[in-house]
Amino acid sequence: MGEAEMNEDVYVLGIETSCDETAAAVVKNGREVLSNVVASQMESHRRFGGVVPEIASRHHVEQITLVIEEAMQQAGVSFASLDAVAVTAGPGLVGALLVGVNAAKALAFAHGLPLIGVHHIAGHIYANQLVAEMKFPLLALVVSGGHTELVFMKEHGNFAVIGETRDDAAGEAYDKVARALGLPYPGGPHIDRLAHEGEPVIDLPRAWLEEGSYDFSFSGLKSAVLNALHNAKQRGEEIDPRQMAASFQASVVDVLVTKTVQAAKEYRVRQVLLAGGVAANRGLRAALQDKMKELPDVELVIPPLSLCTDNAAMIAVAGTVLYQQGKRADLALNANPSLPLV
């Protein structure tokens, strides 16, 4: 970053529509949130027990202009004051992504602004920069509905995925187990709440995989829970949902936290970041804080709940980093539902 760039304020509008939240935000200098507007569609998807892509896209089309206008108004800035427009280009639902990408392209073209395509997971990681300055090398544990990854970073924009899920993401497992327990969608917060009322007394598997692997696997655990519930029902017995929630969460959290701390030791990082929607989970936050006591010299950064779930402030922050590195997209930018991080 040059001297001139350091002295000039940088204002970036972020836009996020990768799944079921329509979001826009204005961030100053990659550190100060001037506005962060999120229109959630949760109620529309709840009765279906999951996100319906077609419904998500329609809601984004209805909301996108209003959400962007509100973000600009709350921030008290004009389009003339902006330095760039950053938008989630992937991964996500293709129809949902297209709404945000096309809105960003239209704004960039109309106002002569640089356009920046941002990876959704990079956004989740960079949400932490709104809490603390990033110190490299660092390790990020990204846990969301569709992703469970350990990402090592040597410097800004340099991502190495050292561990990822081989089947279900942690968030998917939460939703499927919640459904089996008769809990509403989205299941994560409900399991977290029940887990705090129960004890992890049910013996459930933990998939450590082969020695030295930082990958994750949650499908076996999910199947074990579903089988236990099914077998109990066949026998005419009832399993206390609080004990099952506590046991399931203990298994997920144990593997996530143990592998994260092992990797932090091996890669000799200065900082560990928690990122993604499941990062809002109280059980995970508490367990990671406790286990990180083994590494007193490593800083643990956990974003506030509002920055864990999908939002556009994180996209604006990641976009600011790319802007300052001179990286730009052109008007051929397209939505990529399976965009790789690396």
Swiss-Prot record:
Binds 1 Fe(2+) ion per subunit. It catalyses: L-threonylcarbamoyladenylate + adenosine(37) in tRNA = N(6)-L-threonylcarbamoyladenosine(37) in tRNA + AMP + H(+). Disulfide bonds: none annotated. SUPFAM superfamilies: Actin-like ATPase domain (SSF53067). Its EC number is 2.3.1.234. Its main location: cytoplasm. Keywords: Acyltransferase, Cytoplasm, Iron, Metal-binding, Transferase, tRNA processing. One of its GO terms (biological process) is tRNA threonylcarbamoyladenosine modification. InterPro entries: ATPase_NBD (IPR043129), Gcp-like_dom (IPR000905), KAE1/TsaD (IPR017861), Peptidase_M22_CS (IPR017860), TsaD (IPR022450). Substrate binds at V142, V143, S144, G145, G146, D175, G188, D192, N281. It is found in: Cytoplasm. This is tRNA N6-adenosine threonylcarbamoyltransferase. It comes from Geobacillus kaustophilus (strain HTA426). The gene is tsaD.
